[in-house]
From Swiss-Prot:
The keyword Endoplasmic reticulum does not apply. The gene is rplL. GO terms for molecular function: mRNA binding; structural constituent of ribosome. This is Large ribosomal subunit protein bL12. Signal peptide: none annotated. Belongs to the bacterial ribosomal protein bL12 family.
């Protein structure tokens, strides 16, 4: 690889999860592409080849906000904003659109942590 691509790779390795998410959104906007479409295709291939083993090998999960207590709406909104890095308006729209996927394609540990954080403040979450 060239020195320039090596430098970019090292910079990417140092990004936090939130920064990486923001970078993906900026790349999608700048180049008119969608990371979600290609991830869905990649996930479909192992399931088709593996047959019954697909459920055991699942490594990416979607965290879905199913509902929330009306009294806890602000706390749920704050938890969603913290987890996604969205602005207030976008996070509010996401929470009010429940049931809605909050995060997609995350590891099991991250999904469980997010579920716990949102349920602690009054949201009902499922992991798919």
């Amino acid at each position: 690889m060239s020195a320039k691509t090596d430098e970019i790779l090292e910079s990417l390795k140092s990004l936090s999860l939130l920064e990486a998410s923001e970078l993906v959104k900026q790349i999608e906007d700048a180049f008119g592409v969608s990371a979600a479409a290609s991830a869905g295709v990649v996930m479909a291939a192992p399931g088709a080849a593996g047959g019954g083993d697909a459920a055991e090998e699942k490594t990416e999960f979607d965290v879905v906000l199913e509902s929330f207590d009306a009294a806890a709406k602000i706390k749920v909104l704050k938890a969603v904003r913290e987890a996604t890095g969205l602005g207030l308006g976008d996070a509010k729209a996401m929470v009010e659109a429940a049931p809605k996927a909050i995060k997609e394609g995350v590891s099991k540990d991250d999904a469980e942590a997010l579920k716990k954080a949102i349920e602690e403040v009054g949201g009902k979450v499922t992991i798919k």
